[in-house]
Amino acid sequence: MTVQAVALPLKRFLLIEQCPDAWLGLDLYLFQDDAVVFYVGQSQLAFARVWEHLLGGFKGHSITGRFVWVNWPRSMNFTIELLSSQDAQFSHLHNDLNAAEQWLIRQRAPCFNVTHNALATAVPATYLPANAKFRRRISLRKLLFEAERAVKAEDIARW
């Protein structure tokens, strides 16, 4: 069964090693917190592209990924939203991937999108800018361990 959208905290996203089959049709993605969208993007496989941003952030190849890591551990509560351009919400755009991405950018005014974003939202002052120095230079393995611990603690608290 293919889903049309999924949203989950970054800490949970990080624990998913392979793209679930149901997510293979998701071709749009958003990095966001409760108040602001940081980035909107598109890819034939949104799951993999989000991972590219995250991994590229360590080397400065992705401003979005770098922003996530300089704001760690707070950023582990960011939401990763994956969408399908084929969803009914994009029918007025004839479910065109490029048009859907552009529409999301215009509607959500993300911080880091430049193209199609005349009114980009400023990064909230409560966050470090993407060009800030890493406060803690640690490995991806260590970050994944921290995410896993946070998820376990959250799950225990729910019970």
Per-region residue spans from a language model:
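Boundary/linker segments flanking structured domains
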Residues: 1-26, 32-38, 44-159
